[in-house]
Amino acid sequence: MEDIVYTTEHEWLKVGSSSITVGVTDHAQQQLGDVVYVELPDLETEFFAGDEAAVIESVKAAGEITIPFDGVVVEINETLVEQPDLLNTAPQTEGWMFRVVPKDKF
């Protein structure tokens, strides 16, 4: 069973059985405006809670995605890199950003 957790930074975390999928909320993408660029982390990058993991640039602003837990990146959404507008059109489905295996149970 997967649960979705929302952070105060307007990120969503879909908690799966072995990994957590990270993305931005519809509210966040509305505040950013048209997204033109997304920089995702490299595979196998290790993060600690509070680390900057990704960057989103739009016509209005730039924003960082931070990780609220320790973990290692196991998958990135390559389609999102090529089509950053997915963050505007489908932020909580096809616009997911990356998956992380948490160091500790989340």
Predicted regions and their residues:
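ABC ATPase A-loop
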Residues: 5, 60, 64
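Acidic, low-complexity mobile loops and tails
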Residues: 1-55, 83-106
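Generic hydrophobic/packing signal
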Residues: 69, 77, 102-104
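Short, surface-exposed secondary-structure boundary micro-motifs
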Residues: 52, 58-59, 76-78
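Short, charged/polar surface micro-motifs in flexible loops or helix N-caps
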Residues: 30, 72-73, 79-80
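Beta-solenoid/beta-rich acyl/carboxylate-transfer cores
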Residues: 46, 64, 70-72
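Periplasm/extracytoplasmic soluble domains of Gram-negative envelope assemblies
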Residues: 58-61, 69
